[in-house]
A protein has these predicted regions:
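Conserved, mostly hydrophobic/aromatic
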Residues: 73, 195, 240, 295, ...
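N-terminal secretory signal peptides
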Residues: 1-20
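Structural preference for beta-strand elements that scaffold enzyme active sites
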Residues: 69, 100, 170-172, 198, ...
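Mid-to-C-terminal alpha-helical segments outside catalytic/metal-binding sites
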Residues: 22-32, 343-384
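C-terminal segment of N-terminal export signals and the immediately downstream linker at the start
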Residues: 15, 37-74
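A metal-dependent hydrolase metal-coordination microenvironment
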Residues: 85, 92-185, 214-218, 224-225, ...
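Short acidic/histidine-rich active-site segments
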Residues: 298-299, 321-342
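Histidine/acidic residue-rich metal-binding segments in metalloenzymes
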Residues: 87-89, 183-193, 197, 215-262, ...
Length: 384
């Protein structure tokens, strides 16, 4: 289930979702529902859907249309195999008037698990070749998805701008964790040929790329193999994502890469984060910014309880890294409800309106909501 969100209406009967109410109420000012969950009065006055924001505020609607909206980190459905999406991702991108989603599959999904304390840990070692075979299945899943939902793949410079111009929902195909390499850099060329243009180097499972934030750091940051992988990403034309990596890893990656770095999903702590935290320090954020890169703000339910909280976190990241170096990285699932505080792309106009209320200028919103990622994408991928 999605986390309860103060920017949305109060709970309503289980037979009717909050979003169903909002999308069916149209311009009505009052509605009363009775049942086991109690009574909902005046839902439209306490929260609006993205569609209602667009209809009610022409200025926000025009701004949304001018924004090339991109989520730098979202998940493909399911942990393994090729599950069917719970809903139409392309339609949600289209209704929210976004442009693209960096849609990933975690390369270590078969060997990790969320445990009762809510931490994700490695539960077993993979069999030789297992994670490569898993990735090959997921590449086929992406092929099927693009065909079934009519999505575009962003593969080269200009593709994201064209998707925005044509109002055609797009994905930047992403792998979260380079575990599929299993020591073979040649496989990077294979996933590139299959449409991958964004690679996150590490995830939860211990990687030969280097140290991650959620395991004891014992590899000195970035390994020589990790450095070679960065060079290969630069050669092929792949966006380099250092989410989940330690600060020492990121510092070495900044030296190794010829292109700016993305840190797709995190939040910036006020000081030094706790051990094994996925948050980053201000110095860590500024390190990414120093490459010309972008830090994506996630929607962690353990940290943020509303879309307003999320926008506040974006503002805090901007204060640290600068408006040219912050973006959206929701860490939601593109295909079903999650605990992420922003779990539905139809809410994009709500985010834009909240940013305006928070004091962001239209130009700043265009940068944060997608322009900054677009800059790094175009500097990283090939022209043709």
């Amino acid at each position: 289930m999605s986390a309860m969100n103060p920017d949305r209406p109060k709970a309503i009967p289980a037979s009717l979702t909050r979003r169903d109410v909002l999308r069916n109420m149209g311009g009505l000012g009052l509605l009363t529902l009775t049942g086991g969950a109690g009574t909902l009065l005046g839902a439209c006055t306490t929260a609006q859907s993205g569609s209602q924001v667009l209809a009610a505020d022409p200025e926000i609607a025009a701004l949304v249309d001018s924004v090339l909206g991109i989520d730098m980190h979202s998940h493909a459905a399911g942990a393994s195999g090729r599950p069917q999406p719970a809903y139409d991702l392309a339609e949600r991108i289209r209704v929210g008037r976004m442009t693209a989603v960096c849609l990933c599959h975690p390369g270590d999904a078969p060997v990790i698990k969320r445990e009762p304390d809510n931490r994700i840990r490695t539960v077993r070692q993979p069999e030789p070749g297992e994670l490569w075979r898993f990735t090959q299945r997921r590449l086929k899943w992406f092929d099927d998805l693009v065909t079934a939902q009519g999505l575009r793949r962003a593969l080269q410079r200009g593709d994201l701008e064209a998707a925005h111009r044509d109002k055609a929902p797009a994905i930047v195909q992403t792998i979260e964790g380079c575990h599929f390499l299993e020591g073979s850099l040649e496989r990077m060329g294979e996933v590139y040929r299959r449409g991958v243009r964004h690679l996150q180097l590490v995830h939860f499972f211990r990687s030969d790329m280097g140290d991650n934030q959620t395991e004891p750091a014992d590899q000195g940051g970035l390994t020589s193999f990790g450095r070679d992988a960065i060079v290969e990403c630069n050669r092929l034309g792949i966006v380099i994502d250092v989410a989940h990596a330690t600060r020492e890893f990121v510092a070495a990656a900044a030296q190794a890469s010829k292109t700016p770095l993305i840190l797709s999903h995190t939040s910036v702590a006020k000081g030094q984060p706790a051990a094994f935290s996925r948050r980053i320090s201000p110095e860590h954020a500024r390190l990414v910014a120093s490459t010309g890169g972008v830090v994506g703000v996630w929607g962690s339910p353990s940290t943020f309880k509303s879309l307003s909280d999320y926008v506040d976190a974006v503002a805090a990241a901007v204060d640290v890294a600068g408006v040219e170096h912050v973006g959206f990285g929701t860490d939601n699932s593109g295909f079903g409800p999650t605990l992420a505080v922003w779990d539905d792309y139809r809410d994009f106009p709500v985010i834009v309106r909240l940013m305006r209320k928070r004091g962001f200028s239209p130009d700043d919103i265009r940068k944060i909501a997608g322009g900054n990622y677009l800059r790094v994408f175009n500097l990283s991928v090939k022209a043709t």
